[in-house]
Amino acid sequence: MALFSKKDKYIRITPNNSLKSSVSRNVPEVPDELFAKCPACKHMIYQKDLGPAKICPTCSYNFRISAQERLTLTVDEGSFQELFTDIETKDPLRFPDYQAKLQKARQATGLHEAVLTGTALVKGQRLALAIMDSHFIMASMGTVVGEKITRLFELAISERLPVVIFTASGGARMQEGIMSLMQMAKVSAAIKKHSNAGLFYLTILTDPTTGGVTASFAMEGDMIIAEPQSLVGFAGRRVIETTVRENLPDDFQKAEFLKEHGFVDAIVKRTDLRDRIAHLVAFHGGVS
């Protein structure tokens, strides 16, 4: 018989659940909205350092902002009068879960649809204004978006106003099928009438502007300006590369690439847009 028993290789520890719960309660929690990660430089940024314009202090990347934030940055305080808020989609295809998706987007954004339309003053210059919000079903263009923008141009013709549109969209709204594609032609016809009346139309391309919006009113302005590094295109990069069987340049479909090739007139910093809009509208016979 051995004098000494063999020792275990490991020390058994019984977990103390009460200690674990006590420690977890004392760990501070950081609110999700306190910091933002820049998609460009990958730096973590304290939200307050972004400022109201939501521009990365490290690399100057322009974060996507809501229509309401854009409105605050652009127009004279208290001058905006919203129009055409009573237009509703007829949901022509009875697309599954479409109404639920619309309701969710309305609750998340505070908007009734993907575009905010109305009249406003920008440094004293009166104009008709539309701002698309990519947070609302990616600002896809359905019948309501098309109708609101068409009516805005009709109002601008009757009141002799310039039109300014901030574009941001993933394209036509698939839940409305061919009816969404019809909006491209309808809005373009209204733009033509506005142009024939000798009135000024300015488009401002923001990230992202793609699909049917790019193929219609986004690229039909008398002047086309864009925010830095905005994604602007029709089809997606992978679709194009697969179709043409070639690798595209790294900066393909960026605003700077489009300016270099003559599709955009100017790249303007977000913080300078208000001054630039007022200057261009006044230069083209604006209304004050």
From Swiss-Prot:
Its EC number is 2.1.3.15. Its main location: cytoplasm. Pathway: Lipid metabolism; malonyl-CoA biosynthesis; malonyl-CoA from acetyl-CoA: step 1/1. Binds 1 zinc ion per subunit. The keyword Metal-binding applies. It comes from the Bacteria. SUPFAM superfamilies: ClpP/crotonase (SSF52096). One of its GO terms (molecular function) is ATP binding. It is an enzyme of class 2 (transferase). Residues 34-288 form the CoA carboxyltransferase N-terminal domain. Belongs to the AccD/PCCB family. Acetyl-CoA carboxylase is a heterohexamer composed of biotin carboxyl carrier protein (AccB), biotin carboxylase (AccC) and two subunits each of ACCase subunit alpha (AccA) and ACCase subunit beta (AccD). This is Acetyl-coenzyme A carboxylase carboxyl transferase subunit beta. It comes from Streptococcus equi subsp. equi (strain 4047). The lineage of its organism: Bacteria, Bacillati, Bacillota, Bacilli, Lactobacillales. The gene is accD.
